[in-house]
Amino acid sequence: LQNMVDELNRLIDDADKARAADRQFIEDLRGVDNQYDGPWRKTIVDEDFTDGYMAKKSSWQTIAGDFQLRRGLGLYSDVQARQQPAPGSSSQTSSEEAAALLIGAIFDQAMKKDKKETATSRQHDDYASIASKKTVSNAFAIDMTLDVSSLEGQFEIGVYQGNPNGNGYRLVFQPGAGNGSIELLRLGSRGKSIIDLRDKLSAKGDQIHRLQWTRTKVGNMSISLNGKTILQTADRSFKDKYTGIVMNKQGGAFAVKQLTVQGT
């Protein structure tokens, strides 16, 4: 695409110099051309996961949960939370012991602890994360095709500095039939914060969705869903390069079909 844009630029310049077309027509052509002529000329990642193979030197590493390559589908994860047995359901617990546990604050504390551990276990069970150590310029363009099997869960892609849980940006996509959402997050020394949010999106399950995310050298960011611009915002918190790309999944079933990351 960039080669075509460069060639179009050359033809427009030649037509302008030769006065071969109306001035307004030339300006209109430049306006269309500028929509596709970005500063991201260097390809950092170019993956077609549907062929069942990782690209050479891609260095993807699973950090948590499970991701699998499936020919025709892509990089797939459908790790689901395991239900924990309800407190007191064990057949080995006698009625006398159960009655004793019902007495006083000891039982209350035990219940609170059990609920907390169960929630933590569920969160870990349906979470999956994969990352690749790649130097990404501060200005970047990410283009991802995602197969969404249901309306459950959320998928996240981002760039980081240091380690996959380190400082950087995250784009969080949650499918939904009229209640989907896209969040742009910043992870910094003070924790996680929302830069911008768009909700009430129509992003149905059992469909393929395309996410595009660009960042310019001055920190302007744009996010598109299926060719439609959803968010336009700016953040200048990070001025250095990023050291990797991370993808996280929480619940649901998602498959990354194609992923392209470009830089300057």
What are the roles of these predicted feature ranges?
Residues 224-229:
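Short strand-turn-strand beta-turns centered on an Asx-Gly dipeptide
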Residues 80-187:
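Secretory/extracellular carbohydrate-interaction modules
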Residues 233-261:
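Flexible glycan-contacting loops in extracellular carbohydrate-active proteins
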Residues 34-35, 127-134, 196-203, 246:
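Beta-strand-rich interaction surfaces with strong enrichment in secreted/lumenal proteins
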Residues 187-212:
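Short, aromatic/His-centered strand-loop micro-motif at the edge of beta-sheets
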Residues 1-64, 80-93:
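Extracellular carbohydrate-recognition regions
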Residues 49, 142-144, 206-223:
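Short tryptophan-centered beta-strand motifs in secreted/extracellular beta-sheet-rich domains
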Residues 60, 64-71, 171-175, 213-214, ...:
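Short, exposed beta-strand/loop patches in secreted or surface proteins that constitute
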